[in-house]
């Protein structure tokens, strides 16, 4: 579960390395986000020469969480880190590569470009 002030790894090559959650989108009193949810975040660490800079406010979709997600068949999927991919308003990623595995739940959320770029979908 990702909430306000949570720091996340960035799993793409947009130039950001770490982001801090500002707000969870999707409802007025929503406190937590899970895999496939969109957040507004601030870039805390960035690589030089990247598309996004430190201090930029960006939208991101969560692709991995330590808490994990429950599947309809009763199984759970958990990851070793909390990670997100920076996206544009039309749900396409800002970067051109995705690093690490992503969850299958992104396919139902309409993030097919992220799923197709990912090296592994679990």
From Swiss-Prot:
PROSITE patterns: RIBOSOMAL_L14 (PS00049)
Keyword rRNA-binding: yes
GO function terms (MF aspect): large ribosomal subunit rRNA binding; structural constituent of ribosome
Family per similarity comment: Belongs to the universal ribosomal protein uL14 family.
Protein's name in the database: Large ribosomal subunit protein uL14
One cellular component term from this protein's GO annotations in UniProt: cytosolic large ribosomal subunit
Subunit relationships: Part of the 50S ribosomal subunit. Forms a cluster with proteins L3 and L19. In the 70S ribosome, L14 and L19 interact and together make contacts with the 16S rRNA in bridges B5 and B8.
UniProt cross-references to InterPro entries, sorted A to Z: Ribosomal_uL14, Ribosomal_uL14_bac-type, Ribosomal_uL14_CS, Ribosomal_uL14_sf
This protein's record includes keyword RNA-binding: yes
Keyword annotations of the record: Ribonucleoprotein, Ribosomal protein, RNA-binding, rRNA-binding
Gene Ontology annotations of biological process type: translation
Superkingdom per UniProt: Bacteria
Biological role: Binds to 23S rRNA. Forms part of two intersubunit bridges in the 70S ribosome.
């Amino acid at each position: 579960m990702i909430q306000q002030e949570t720091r996340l790894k960035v799993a793409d090559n947009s130039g950001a390395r770490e982001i801090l959650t500002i707000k969870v989108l999707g409802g007025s009193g929503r406190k937590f986000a899970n895999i496939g949810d969109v957040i507004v975040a601030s870039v805390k660490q960035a690589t030089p020469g990247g598309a996004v800079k430190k201090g930029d406010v960006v939208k991101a979709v969560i692709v991995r969480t330590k808490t994990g997600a429950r599947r309809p068949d009763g199984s759970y999927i958990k990851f070793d880190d909390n990670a997100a991919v920076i996206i544009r308003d039309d749900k396409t990623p800002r970067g051109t590569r995705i690093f690490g595995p992503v969850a299958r739940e992104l396919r139902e959320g309409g993030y097919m470009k992220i799923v197709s770029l990912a090296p592994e979908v679990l």
